Amino acid sequence: MVESLSLLEGSWIIKGTDFPMWASKKRKNPMITYKKISNNPTKFLDTVKYETKSKSKQIDGIDTYSTTKFIWRGKGILKVLKSEWSILVLTERILVIRFERSLVTPAGIDILVRDNVEVDDPKQFILESLKDGILKKEEIECLIWL
């Protein structure tokens, strides 16, 4: 897995999710950017950007890969928060992540498409791209498509 983590770098647009923060649609256009920190292939700056009715917002953290999962730690005032997440699918065009329940968030799934990839029907594109068995039928049915 460490060898393929270079594919993670770049900006990704959340297209499908069951995470309440995005599913409520009060926060729009969620995007996550991963940038490798120094020469460490297992540590990334994680920047989440989104829009509310009145302004753009940003959440910054550091992701550190450890064996089979990432450990996210917030930056600044969010430094006290941490969460764990894992990659289910990582290609040049699609990223599917599963995040564990944390102190302030429920467990869930995000399905992302790389920022520069044009997709007419994100749901169809993603469902056709997923390997059988990556997500359970009930997990797919719970997704909200943004």
State the predicted function of each range:
Residues M1-L146:
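A beta-rich soluble binding module of mature secreted/lumenal proteins
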